[in-house]
Design a protein with these regions (language model features):
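DNA major-groove recognition helix of helix-turn-helix/homeodomain DNA-binding modules
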Residues: 51-69
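Short, charged recognition helix plus adjacent turn
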Residues: 71-99, 121-125
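Short acidic alpha-helix initiation/capping motifs at coil-to-helix transition points
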Residues: 2-4, 13-15, 47-55, 82-87
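A short, Lys/Arg-rich alpha-helix, primarily the initiator
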Residues: 1-23, 27, 102-136
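Key DNA-contact positions within bacterial/archaeal DNA-binding proteins
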Residues: 22, 33-36, 68
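Recognition helix of helix-turn-helix/homeodomain-like DNA-binding domains
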Residues: 29-51, 75-78
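Long, compositionally biased
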Residues: 61-63, 87-116
Length: 137
């Protein structure tokens, strides 16, 4: 049995949905440079720095993937949603319970949840808005 690469799995999911690159960018709130970076990823660590957990979670939510498929996709980039991390729990909740939510609405919810907690919003917000500061795995 061969293991799919991140790109194989992602573009298979996109193809199954029949979405164009423009539709993916809009649904996942990704700018073109970010999506281009995703398209040209390889499996080395150096290619990961622009594709953070927030960007990957935005793909999962924007594409309305279930939690099982989302976790598989995240794992292919070396990420996992920790049950001990409140931000990861919020992401998990959005994936599991808020199917069809827009990334803008998800970001609004995240902002409300973490306002006043001392969390740096650029490290929480999804899509191209959340990649500037990087992310912890």
């Amino acid at each position: 049995m061969t293991t799919k690469s991140f790109q194989d799995m992602l573009f298979s999911l996109i193809q199954q949905k029949g979405w164009s690159e423009k539709e993916i960018c809009e649904a996942c709130l990704l700018d073109r440079p970010r999506f281009t970076a995703i398209k040209h990823l390889n499996d080395d660590a150096a290619s990961t720095h622009n594709v953070t957990l927030q960007v990957l979670v935005a793909l999962c939510i924007g594409m309305q993937l279930n939690i099982t498929v989302s976790e598989q996709l995240l794992a292919l980039r070396g990420y996992a949603l920790s049950k001990r991390n409140p931000i990861h729990n919020a992401y998990r909740y959005l994936i599991e319970r808020c199917s069809g939510i827009s990334i803008d609405d998800a970001n609004e919810l995240l902002t409300e949840l973490f306002a006043g907690t001392g969390a740096v919003l650029d490290r929480i917000l999804l899509g191209s808005r959340g990649y500037r500061q990087g992310s912890d795995k």
